[in-house]
Amino acid sequence: MPYTLEDLKAHGLSPAEYQQIQQQLGRDPNPNELAMFGVMWSEHCCYKNSRPLLKNFPTTGERVVVGPGENAGVVDLGEGDWLAFKIESHNHPSAVEPFQGAATGVGGILRDIFTLGARPIALLNSLRFGPLTDPRNRRLMARVVEGIAHYGNCVGVPTVGGEVAVDPCYSGNPLVNVMALGLLETPAVVKSAARGVGNPVLYVGATTGRDGIRGASFASAELKEDAQQDRPAVQVGDPFLGKCLIEACLEAFATGAVVAAQDMGAAGITCSTAEMAAKGGVGIRFDLDRVPARESGMAAWEYLLSESQERMLLVVQKGREAEVMEIFHRWGLQASVAGEVIAEPLVEIWHQGSCVVQVPVRALAEDTPVYVRPVLPEPPAYVQAAWQWDPATLPPCDCQGIHLAQATLAWKEVLLQLLASPTLASKAWIYRQYDHQVQNNTVLWPGQGDAAVIRIRSQRFGVGEVPPLRASRKAIAATLDGNGRWVYLDPYEGAKAAVAEAARNLTCVGADPLAVTDNLNFGNPENPVVYWQLALACRGIGDACRALGTPVTGGNVSLYNETLTPQGSQAIYPTPVIGMVGLIPDLKCICGQGWQQEGDLIYLLGSQALTSLGGSEYLAVIHQQVTGRPAPVDLELEKRVQAACRHGIRQGWVRSAHDCSEGGLAVALAEACLSGGRGATLSLAPGSLRWDQALFGEGSSRILVSVDPAQRSAWEAYLEAQLAGQWQLLGEVGSPADPLLLRTAEEDPLLVVSLAAMQAAYHGAFSD
């Protein structure tokens, strides 16, 4: 073997994988070919550890136009409108260069959308950081937010929603997941399969440099404590060039001359040529000397592994290349004929007049390693210990508060502490840095509803024309949801809960949930405990998606989210993030989360009994414990609760709707007060529950709604038929001067807290 073990390790390959390469080639690979195998056989590109588990996901449905395998999923919204959507991660790059790591994460996911022929219309993000009391974490968070805002604002795509959570497990390894949505402009989806022997392959976009080299391999290994040395693996983005690329590509696609398109993301030219050829069952001959370079003296392997941003490969009809290139030149972009489609299924790379790579397409893109690892037959020790936890071990509590050893902590103080915790606190400081109204289609923006709502406007209009409003007044809703702590304590139920919460958030704004894109953020799959977490989480996602009728159209897997330190390896919580889109039939029937009118009746849909303190924010913040077992998800009840909420919204009975999730019922009530600027008076009976569980216990299948009192009879008759007693009337909405007043059924006070006090706590965690 001409390579040492250190050589293989540098490329992320094992000795066994090198033997596979030798067998497939019938020889040793040359250094350029080895570099290509290193990135194409990385977890980031070939999903060698997760691919068998992803087969558990449902991927087809009545509205699915494009499922997994293309640059993004596509669903049919009716009336000729198709929606493309996808989520991606940029975790490792954001850890070492947070501004560019986050910014290029936005640029990359936008390319996945417009590569299909869709105009990007919205962005969302899901972020995880370590405690903000650590200056490093706070700086990292600020730079990530700045990077997201920079690219999204400059490229002209609104950032309309997302989520942020804070936990010590993310200190060394933050998570930056970005989701994008787009509406198809082309009559058909632009696919990535190269076709037509002799058709030219065009390189378009920005020039190629040395930034981002081996970025895919970097994303497929644990972060080292001295991760700053990996900064060259982080790409550098240009949103203004990205905007030009969007317009040029959509204009080129409209000519009908483009046969296939693929963005140059992870693994750059290597991945684009191999995947386009593999999907088309053809080969590609490519000449690196025709690639516009921004640096001199680049070696072949540097061209092949560069992940310079804002670049695309196009296969165009022979004879029409000049027509397409003129479009890109007019937009100030590079465009050159750098290759051609060939019949023999090979990736053939030329450099300085010599053939430097000749590899079977299947070896790079299809016959990659797949590892089916054994799944632990029973939960690991940490989970079994957590499940033995009993709430009775907590200090006693009553209607006055929790009686800690040093003093009684009143429920008002508990609520204020929870509202001030970074995971629950207002994220206004973050989302105010994002332009969430550019394009003028955002109907519900951050802080107004449980999901973002975007108006659908025609995307098929000429330059300089104003897009017409649709007579049908349809809209799209989108959300991102995840709870790493729940998945850590129960991967199966925690993953189910993430899917259920995403659907519930869409329901709360009046949308029918349609489909899912998922981002699986986990640790090292070679660790049996991590693989068990991953396997059970995938099973939970699959089961929940089947039950709720939300097929998975694609997604992203981000493994090795661990930090290697002298003390060992620190892994993140297993954190699947669910991106879900929904359809609102009529914009007249949407709902925000805040109270609307004084005197409206407040109802809780769902069962208080299906809650738990296990894994709750209350347990973590007040008692500094991460233990217990999260509440199981009753998917049948979930469907009925969501159906009841949507029906109430569309009948005009329900005036506000808000999901009860992190922080439990009391926090949901406070959020509805703060969002609507009104107090409320309510009565609560704990039943057999402890008071802290009744107030702050967490679970699925619960929605808080306010209802027009004139519709009480019709609403309650419908609820009883639909939910059979699994609902309760809690109280009524007050005025802007009223506090949040919670009492027992016997009229004893539980908590009284003013809007001003709640606002002060809620808006204090994130600020300059």
UniProtKB/Swiss-Prot annotation:
Pathway info: Purine metabolism; IMP biosynthesis via de novo pathway; 5-amino-1-(5-phospho-D-ribosyl)imidazole from N(2)-formyl-N(1)-(5-phospho-D-ribosyl)glycinamide: step 1/2
Entry's EC annotation: 6.3.5.3
Keyword list, A-Z: ATP-binding, Cytoplasm, Ligase, Magnesium, Metal-binding, Nucleotide-binding, Purine biosynthesis
CDD domains with a match to the protein in the record: PurL_repeat1, PurL_repeat2
Localization (cell): Cytoplasm
Manganese listed as a keyword: no
Example of a GO biological process term: 'de novo' IMP biosynthetic process
Residues that hold ATP according to the record: Y47, K86, D518, G555
Residue sites binding Mg(2+) 1 per the record: E88, N556
Superkingdom assignment: Bacteria
Catalytic activity: N(2)-formyl-N(1)-(5-phospho-beta-D-ribosyl)glycinamide + L-glutamine + ATP + H2O = 2-formamido-N(1)-(5-O-phospho-beta-D-ribosyl)acetamidine + L-glutamate + ADP + phosphate + H(+)
Database matches in Gene3D superfamilies: PurM-like C-terminal domain, PurM-like, N-terminal domain
One Gene Ontology CC term in the entry: cytoplasm
Active-site feature positions: H44, H90
Residues binding substrate: S89, H90, N91, H92, R111, Q235, E307, S308, Q309, S558
Binding residue positions for Mg(2+) 2: D112, D263
Chief localisation class: cytoplasm
Entry's Gene Ontology molecular function annotations: ATP binding; magnesium ion binding; phosphoribosylformylglycinamidine synthase activity
Subunit structure: Monomer. Part of the FGAM synthase complex composed of 1 PurL, 1 PurQ and 2 PurS subunits.
The protein's role, per its UniProt record: Part of the phosphoribosylformylglycinamidine synthase complex involved in the purines biosynthetic pathway. Catalyzes the ATP-dependent conversion of formylglycinamide ribonucleotide (FGAR) and glutamine to yield formylglycinamidine ribonucleotide (FGAM) and glutamate. The FGAM synthase complex is composed of three subunits. PurQ produces an ammonia molecule by converting glutamine to glutamate. PurL transfers the ammonia molecule to FGAR to form FGAM in an ATP-dependent manner.
Family: Belongs to the FGAMS family.
Protein name in UniProt: Phosphoribosylformylglycinamidine synthase subunit PurL
Originating organism: Synechococcus sp. (strain JA-2-3B'a(2-13)) (Cyanobacteria bacterium Yellowstone B-Prime)
Name of encoding gene: purL
